[in-house]
């Protein structure tokens, strides 16, 4: 893990000369804050850590050409996310009970309408952020724990964009909900369209899913804890 973080710190410095004025640990804590607590639509910070504590049992909402094509992509994305969260992901059949995660595809023109059919409350899929989205996620929380999620993606997107979109939304539905172009290189930076996790993304996932980062942890406490975890892994922060 220590060698892994050394690579991350080198990547941060290469990404932005401004990082020279800020220790690597401080910069990663800032990235953690942007992605975990930022809220691009509400304009205010989310108050607590949200994360999964139970295995994820996912299914595809319907059987169509997009699912046939992109099932291996989703499986690969989940395998990558599992490495850095210690979550388990199991696909179940479309008629099997017990799912807590649903993935659906529809043409962009009908994506919002389709999303409403999968939402716990159709009215929650409303507003400009959905009307202009090429993919989006919905998540449901109990006591800081994520207990259900939906990911919707436009089936007529260009291939590379859809691969990126799936990875970003799947990761965001795990408790890292915000996009922020200050985080680079990262899947959470919409200007880059990465199709695999960057080193920075892997650290952010590890921080959220460190056992000490409990669901419902208030933001201020979580930032202190993230700083302490990074200090253990990179003493001195430089």
Task: Tell me the role of every PLM-derived stretch.
Residues 30, 34, 76, 80-83, ...:
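Charged/polar, solvent-exposed surface patches and flexible loops
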Residues 1-3:
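Positively charged n-region of N-terminal signal peptides that target proteins for export
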Residues 29, 165-168, 197:
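Residue-level recognition of hydrophobic positions within alpha-helical transmembrane segments
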Residues 19-57, 64-66, 133-141, 234-238:
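Disordered inhibitory propeptide/activation segment of secreted metzincin zinc metalloprotease zymogens
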